[in-house]
C-alpha cells in the first residue's frame, strides 16, 4: 500500500469477501454461506449429486424435477434429505399447463416429505397447486407473527408474472382450496399477510425458459416493482430479487450484485460440471462452446 507520508490515513477499504456479496437476509433465510444458487435443469440434469455437493458447501441448489415421474422425484427427495437433513436444498416445481396432474403430484410429494423450499419456474400465472404448497405451510407463532415454513423462489422473466408472485394468494384460489379442505381457514387468513414468493429470480436471456430480456433492463424494473408491492402491502419481510441468465463468469456475477441483485443463480454452465447428470459428450461440447455457437430453439416441453 502506498500513500503520501504527509497526509494522514483516514480510512482503509479492505477487499470484499465473497460472503459479503448479495443480501445477508437471503443467506440467513436459507441457511447458506453465500448468496449463490444453482438453478434446476430438467430431467434430473440438476442431479442429486449436484444438490448434495452444493449443499455441503453452503450453497442452495435446486433439483431438476421437471420431466421426471413421481417415483423418481420421491427417490431423489429421500436421498437428498438423508444426505442434507438440515438442508440447504430446493426442488423444482415447473408449471404444467396441459398436464395439471403432473404439477399436482409434485406438490403432493413436497408436502408429504416436507420439502421446505421450491423453485417455481415457467409459470404464466398462479395455480391452485403452488398456492396450496405455499399456504399449507403458514402458521401463527407464539408472538402472533406469520411463520412461513414452505418457501417459494419464483423464477420469472416477465413483469406481469412477477406481480402475481409479489402479491398475496388470490382469494378465489384460497376459497377453492378451503372448499377442498386442502388448507385451513386460519391458513387462508394468514395468506393475506404474505407474498406468494419469498424470493424472485429475474431470469434474463438464459438457456432455459426465457423471454430474452437483457438483465440490465429487467433486473432494475423488477426491483422497482418490488418496492411498489412492499409499500402497497406492507409486508414485514422484504421480497428479495435475484439475478439469473448469462451469469457465466465471476465478472458477470459481480455486475449483477452491483446492480442490486440479492443473490445470483447459475444454470446452464453447471451442466458441464462433474456432478451434472449429462453425458460426457454433452459436457465436452458445452465446455468448448462460444457465445456465437448458441441459438434459441423451442423448449422440449
Region locations from a protein language model:
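A structural signal for short, well-ordered beta-strand segments and their strand-loop junctions
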Residues: 118-120, 243, 265
Amino acid at each position: 500500500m502506498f500513500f503520501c507520508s504527509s497526509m494522514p490515513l483516514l480510512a482503509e477499504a479492505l477487499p470484499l469477501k465473497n460472503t459479503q456479496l448479495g443480501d445477508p437476509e437471503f443467506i440467513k433465510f436459507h441457511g447458506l454461506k453465500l448468496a449463490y444458487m444453482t438453478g434446476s435443469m430438467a430431467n434430473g440434469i440438476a442431479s442429486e449429486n449436484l444438490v448434495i455437493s452444493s449443499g455441503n458447501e453452503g450453497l442452495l441448489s435446486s433439483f431438476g424435477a421437471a420431466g421426471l415421474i413421481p417415483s423418481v422425484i420421491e427417490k431423489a427427495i429421500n436421498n437428498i434429505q438423508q444426505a442434507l437433513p438440515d438442508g440447504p436444498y430446493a426442488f423444482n416445481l415447473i408449471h404444467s399447463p396441459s398436464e395439471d396432474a403432473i404439477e399436482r403430484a409434485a406438490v403432493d410429494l413436497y408436502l408429504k416429505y416436507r420439502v421446505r423450499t421450491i423453485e417455481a419456474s415457467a409459470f404464466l400465472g398462479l395455480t391452485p397447486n403452488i398456492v396450496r404448497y405455499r399456504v399449507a405451510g403458514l402458521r401463527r407463532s407464539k408472538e402472533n407473527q406469520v411463520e412461513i415454513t414452505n418457501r417459494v423462489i419464483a423464477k420469472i422473466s416477465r413483469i406481469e408474472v412477477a406481480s402475481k408472485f409479489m402479491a398475496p394468494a388470490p382469494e378465489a384460489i384460497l376459497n377453492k382450496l378451503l372448499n377442498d379442505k386442502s388448507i385451513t381457514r386460519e391458513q387462508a387468513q394468514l395468506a393475506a399477510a404474505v407474498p406468494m414468493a419469498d424470493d424472485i429470480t429475474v431470469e434474463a436471456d438464459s438457456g432455459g425458459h426465457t423471454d430474452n430480456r437483457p438483465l440490465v433492463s429487467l433486473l432494475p424494473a423488477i426491483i422497482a416493482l418490488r418496492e411498489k408491492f412492499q409499500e402497497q402491502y406492507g409486508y414485514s419481510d422484504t421480497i428479495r430479487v435475484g439475478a439469473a441468465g448469462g451469469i457465466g463468469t465471476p465478472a458477470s456475477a459481480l455486475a449483477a450484485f452491483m446492480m442490486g441483485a440479492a443473490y445470483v443463480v447459475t444454470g446452464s454452465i453447471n451442466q458441464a460440471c462433474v456432478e451434472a447428470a449429462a453425458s460426457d459428450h454433452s459436457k465436452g461440447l458445452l465446455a468448448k462452446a462460444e457465445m456465437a455457437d448458441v441459438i434459441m430453439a423451442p423448449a422440449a416441453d
